[in-house]
Swiss-Prot record:
Keywords: Aminoacyl-tRNA synthetase, ATP-binding, Cytoplasm, Ligase, Metal-binding, Nucleotide-binding, Protein biosynthesis, Zinc. Its cofactor is Zn(2+). It is found in: Cytoplasm. It comes from Helicobacter pylori (strain HPAG1). Belongs to the class-I aminoacyl-tRNA synthetase family. This is Cysteine--tRNA ligase. GO terms for cellular component: cytosol. The gene is cysS. A motif ('KMSKS' region) lies at residues 269-273. ATP binds at K272. Zn(2+) binds at C27, C207, H237, E241.
Length: 465
């Protein structure tokens, strides 16, 4: 298994800290709004990593957090007259619904930052005791990055590069010093009583503490195998996580760092400030979650994905082929490539080379269909063909529906009954040699984007886009 390590900037063999086990921490969302396509892409990318590792024989522990203490949450909660707990719970539920629709496997653990305040306070106390952290006059606590000789080694940033995004405070020793603890500022603020005084943790300390509490291994030079997230988190978030872990515990946070690429909308980076965020829940109104997942996984995880609906519909044809084959093998069978599972898994073991994996999949679908055409009555390989399709489901998380359910997506139960009645009416017309009426019914359904196919087992139908 090979993965691209952001820190070393090269593809390297995956060699876990404990043989045949992999522990992964993925930065989850700050829950002040619904999930957008960038959140979905990150979740799917590292869901693919998890599935690939599991099918390669690893026991995987994957933790993905919820940041439920943050300035954005506080500001929105005040605006909507809600508590931060009430607001964050709404968006945690929304995020979970969206990821379920995208067939993302549930993490081993989903810690909330608010559940690990004691661990955060303890880590900050350790940094204060080591004289690596310092207070300013308003009570806030910062980390002195000059005490970490490796600061910037992950993201290749240094003090001459724009640190303005971190926020300038006059009493900070260096521009890149970052906040560990924000003291309580008054009625419109949120604070928790602690040995540090009333206040709340900074963003970066939250993830480091949750890594330590949920995954960290003892007596190793690294706490975990893989730390992952979107490329927008590389700096300052992941850089600062790595820094404070080295400073507090004397070890590196992760042996490997993995980052997925941005999602662009019409060739512009998707962001709330540009007003072009595309929420998952809105995309799911138009497209089934499996269709959306299939599209988002179709571009290599490290590349930028430029979202457009035309490409989404093109990618849907791949799903159509999977279900068309599944539909066929449930009735009549042919031979397949016996090395298919090995070949497609090897592609994914090469830094999640999904483009190559999808090419192997396309070849399998085409060759199997050709063999079915040549020998439609051969039933000897039914189990093997269905096992290969099951393997695709487990590896890529697509192709898990019943074919009839897939091809009839977006059709209500009342519409289905109406279509079945029309098919029965057409059947009677054909029996009575009234072919004009039969053709008229077919055309009527076609105009409603319903295609009919006559098979030896009877007429079947599907909805097309």
């Amino acid at each position: 298994m090979f993965i691209y390590d952001t820190k070393s900037k090269q593809k390297v063999p995956f060699e876990p800290l404990v043989k045949n086990k992999a522990n992964i921490y993925v930065c989850g969302p700050t829950v002040y709004d619904d999930a957008h396509l960038g959140h979905a892409r990150s979740a799917i990318a590292f869901d693919l990593l998890r599935r690939t590792l599991e099918l390669s024989g690893y026991e995987v522990m994957l933790v993905r957090n919820f940041t439920d203490i943050d300035d954005k949450i506080i500001n929105k909660a005040l605006k909507e007259n809600k508590s931060i707990q009430e607001l964050s719970s709404i968006y945690i539920e929304s995020y979970t619904r969206d990821l379920n629709a995208l067939n993302v496997k549930k993490p081993s653990l989903e810690p909330k930052a608010s559940e690990y305040l004691d661990a955060m306070v303890h880590m900050i106390e350790t940094l204060l005791e080591k004289n690596i952290a310092y207070r300013v006059s308003n009570g806030d606590i910062y980390l002195d990055t000059s005490k970490d000789k490796d600061y910037g080694s992950l993201s290749v940033h240094n003090s001459s590069i724009e640190f303005g995004r971190i926020g300038l405070v006059q009493e900070k020793r260096l521009e890149q010093d970052f906040v560990l603890w924000k003291s309580y500022k008054g009625d419109n603020d949120v604070g928790f009583d602690s040995p540090l005084g009333k206040g709340r943790p900074g963003w970066h300390i939250e993830c480091s503490s949750m890594v330590f509490e949920t995954l960290a291994l003892a007596n190793t030079p690294y706490q975990i195998d893989i730390h992952a997230g979107g490329s927008d988190l590389l700096f300052p978030h992941h850089e600062n996580e790595a820094c404070q872990t080295r400073c507090a515990f004397g070890v590196e946070l992760a042996k490997y760092w993995m980052h997925n690429g941005f999602v662009n909308i019409n060739n512009e980076k998707m962001s709330k400030s540009l007003g072009n965020s595309f929420f998952v829940k809105d995309a799911l109104k138009n497209y089934d979650g499996e269709i959306l997942r299939n599209y988002l996984l179709g571009v290599h995880y490290r590349s930028v994905l430029n979202f457009n609906e035309e490409d989404l519909l093109v990618s849907k044809k791949r799903l159509d082929k999977i279900y068309r084959l599944k539909q066929r093998v449930l009735g009549t069978l042919g031979g397949i490539n016996p090395n298919f599972k090995k070949e497609i898994l090897e592609c994914m073991q090469d830094d999640l080379n999904v483009s190559k994996a999808l090419s192997v999949l396309e070849n399998m679908l085409s060759s199997t269909n050709e063999k079915l055409d040549q020998n439609p009555k051969n039933k000897a390989l039914k189990g093997e063909i269905l096992a290969n399709l099951k393997f695709v489901e487990e590896l890529l998380g697509i192709g898990f529906k019943d074919p009839s359910a897939y091809f009839q997506l977006g059709v209500s139960e009342s519409e289905k009954q109406e279509i079945e009645n029309k098919i029965e009416e057409r059947k009677r017309a054909k029996e009575q040699k009234d072919f004009l009426k039969a053709d008229r019914i077919r055309e009527e359904l076609l105009n409603r984007k319903i295609a009919l196919m006559d098979t030896p087992q009877g007429t079947i139908w599907e909805k097309f886009f």
